[in-house]
Amino acid sequence: MRNGGVKYRDNDKSASKISDYQSDEAEIKLRYERNYTTLPIKLNFGAGIKYSNYVNDVYRLQFSSGNVVPFQYHSSIDLLSYQAFVQASDQYLNNRFKVSLGVNLVGNTFTASMSNPIKQLSPRLSLSYSFSDDFDLNANIGHYAMPPSYTTMGYRNTEGNYVNRSNGLKYITSNQAIVGMEYHPGNFLRFSLEGFYKQYSHYPISLTDGISLASKGVDYGQVGDEAVMSTGDGRAYGVEVVAKLMGWRDIDLTASYTLFRSEFTDKNGIYRPSSWDTRHILNLTTSYKLPKGWYISARWRYIGGAPYSPIDVERSTNKAAWSITNQAYTDYERFNTLRLADAHQLDVRLDKEFYFKHWMLNLYLDVQNAYISNMPSKPIYTNRDTEGRVMDDPTSPDTKQLLRTLVYYSGTILPTVGIMIKF
């Protein structure tokens, strides 16, 4: 798999490059798995190995110690990963009580710590009990391990060292517990309630800005391409309620509400909201089957405000620093301390199906944001006035600039006409 991106100053291809990267990932996998269904218990076990080759070529300008400096490296890593697993399951009490127990082992050759699969030992247990034909209780608990990205493993510093290997990069681990119940009276109704708690350890934290990589998104470019330490923690917990009406007089209705928190520690061990910590999500969906192959459906969503960060005014008003990104810099000391307003949106869709002997034709009209709701977004900053001129700071016009705020709302209606053919 190949990834890449090039950015030019002022988006002018005749100008000098600000950043240029290209990465290639190649994998060869071998896996063995065996199932036994005739034993007193169901047994599944297996093992696998994976050879990976990762190559990354990076060039970018950086603002460091008040100066714009180029940064460039080439990396190539060969990695052997391995896995073994076993899972046993059975049913008791006239199949009302179901139990599943499993263990997973993973490792790779990047660091001494990651090469020992015992350190990534991952047991998990699943229980389910049917109190009656219409009431079930479920519970899951487990420990999981996930390797860091190739980008993070392949990062090299200015001296050409794989610093994250020297920093003792580790598998990201997670302890998860989920408890839920489901009540389904009759043929049409279904209600469920679920609570969850997820605790993360060894999450990579950036040594440059001191925040967890878990909170870095596409706004940050190639995520993980930096020096990190596997010292971050995280937690996500909440509850979800779902109610469904299915197949009643050709009507389907679903209502779900999720109340949750998602937080990761920074370099000082302080929990900060993750970038997707909207805290609550409400979804209402409905569909109705009309005569002659017509269907109409709708979905209404209400989402809590996402967190965002104020800008680093000192760095953002520096002309040299601005020339690299052409946008404001994040104030990582106050990371995700602000929050957008809540948002809501209605999507509607109309389908018409035509059935033929060996295939089906589906025509549809989909309208997103049907009532043109203004979706709040974090402020955008510009260094230009309304006439397009750079706003020099009168106190230091050669090196400093002024900024103004553009309030942006993504409140556009988006209609789509489509055709689907199924054989």
Where are the predicted features?
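Outer membrane beta-barrel strand-and-loop segments of large Gram-negative receptors
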Residues: 19-35, 72-73, 77-85, 166, ...
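Face-selective signature of the C-terminal outer-membrane beta-barrel domain
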Residues: 1-114, 130, 189-192, 254
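C-terminal beta-signal and adjacent terminal beta-strands/loops
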Residues: 301-325, 341-345, 352-423
